[in-house]
Structure formats: structure tokens, C-alpha cells
Amino acid sequence: MKSYELITILGPTASGKTTFAAALAAQLDTEIISADSRQIYRSMDIGTGKDLADYNVNGKQIPYHLIDICEPGYKYNVFEYQHDFFRVYEDMKRRGKLPILCGGTGMYIEAVLKGYKLLDVPQNPELRESLRNKTLEELETILASYKILHNKTDVDTAQRAIRAIEIEEYYKTQAPDVNEYNPINSLIIGIHIDRELRREKISRRLRTRLDEGMVDEVRTILATGVKPEDLIYYGLEYKFLTLYIIGELSFEEMVSQLEIAIHQFAKRQMTWFRGMERRGCEIHWIDATLPTEEKIATTMRILNNQL
């Protein structure tokens, strides 16, 4: 009989994974560790879709971890995430909890499930200078030439693509092929949402967030002294809203380009999860449209080795 050390709930943006994870955590009297590369930032609430109200289930507050741990402008990375995750994970295990890992950042999830040894890669000024004038498409071509990508973070800006190349060059000469942490035996639940429904939910949610004040949220962050280029670095909402605020895009252009970018992001998330399956991760897919109670019942049957 398998003995699971963790439950992982993953899925693309707008699949409803957080609502389900919180309900499952309430059922199991446990806590959630977030696996979202942007929800770690304070003040970046609407644009990252924190939806903290989801962590209140029938009046019960579900404890969550690795949300709101950094200030905007800081460039947090998977190396730091891995260390932060295991600190929280070990504490929860000592307290007798079965942790739930929930998120859509596949790189973070895979790094902790497999215990990869990751290096805190320093900047390479000479390499950065040599890449400075290349287009995003040219940088993506360079990235595609590497046999293994240690950092497949979303390269939707040239700055991120250059950082990814920097990491690959460093790993070519520095990285030992060993694990830093023991791999975790996790039950992995994937929330599957039909492509057209996903697109519909993404588009509807974008307009809701704009109505809720997402533009003002970005203005407020910029007013604290965070540089526009540092927000652009985070991509998606923060990239396009910043470009709108500094006058490089009209409102209509911003909404149109952002909507396309989020759809592309969701597709990349699914590509990563399928890649995880090819790399040996067994993912049990559950239909996003099922009622929460049915999702929980299915998960409990798998957890108890009945499926």
C-alpha cells in the first residue's frame, strides 16, 4: 500500500484548483502550501488572483503558506522556493499534517517533488551584454538549443529569456547531477478543464479583475518606487498593465494583448504538466466541472488506494 507524503493539486489558470484544495484541506484538517511564482509577492493581489477568500471554507480558515512573503520588485526564484517549501513541509510533517501543495507553476512543483539539486545562479554581465540586443524570438531559439532546461519559467519577456539562458550556461559547467532533497511520494491530482471553457473563464475573469481595480493596484505598486521594468519582468497582468500605465499601450491594446498572453500561458502550463507525466509523474486528472464534493470523494478513494 502506498503511503503518500503529500497531496499535490495542479492545473492551469482558471481551473478552480484553489477552491478545491481549500475544501480538501478542510476535510483533512490540514494546510496548503502554494506553488505560484507570483502570489509570493505582497500587494500583487488582484493581478495574481490570490482570491484569499477561497481559504475560508464554511467559516473555517485554512492556513496557507508561501503567499505574501516577498516585496514587489524582488526577483524570487525556484532555488529559493525549493528551500522555503521544504522548511514549511518539514514543519507540517512534524505536526502530523498531510500537506497539500497547490498551484500552477509546474517548475516549482516538479523541483520539490523530485528534490532536484538547484544552484543559486549568479548574474553573468558579459553574457547579458552579448544578448542585450536580441529579440525575444532569437532568445527563444537559443533556449531551444539546450538539451535540458533547468529553468523553464515563462519567457514572455526578453529579460526572463536572458535569465533562463544565463542559468543554462551556468549549469553546463557547475551543476552536479545529484538530488539535494529526497523525492516526495505525492498523490498528484490534476484539474482538467475543457479548452473552450478555460478560455471563456479566463476572458471573463480578466474583465472582472479590471473592474475590481487591477489597474489601480499596479499604479499603487509603481507609486511605492518599484521600477516599471521590475513589474514588467513578472509578465502577464503586471507586464501589460505597466505598459498601459506608462503610455506604451492604449487600454484596448492592453486588454487584447493581455488576454492573448493569458491564454498562451494556460497552454504552456498544460504543456508542462504533460511533460511531467512523460518524466514519470503519475497525474490523476479530475474534471473541473464536477461538484467539489465529487472531487473530494474521488481524491479520497485514490488516497485510500481504492482506485
From Swiss-Prot:
Signal peptide feature range: none
Record-listed E.C. numbers: 2.5.1.75
Record-linked SUPFAM superfamilies: P-loop containing nucleoside triphosphate hydrolases
PANTHER family: TRNA DIMETHYLALLYLTRANSFERASE
Obligatory cofactor(s): Mg(2+)
Protein's recorded name: tRNA dimethylallyltransferase 1
Keyword annotations of the record: ATP-binding, Magnesium, Nucleotide-binding, Transferase, tRNA processing
Root EC class: transferase
Quaternary structure annotation from Swiss-Prot or TrEMBL: Monomer.
Organism: Parabacteroides distasonis (strain ATCC 8503 / DSM 20701 / CIP 104284 / JCM 5825 / NCTC 11152)
Family according to the record: Belongs to the IPP transferase family.
Positions that bind substrate: T13, A14, S15, G16, K17, T18
NCBIfam families per the UniProt record, alphabetical: miaA
Keyword Nucleotide-binding: yes
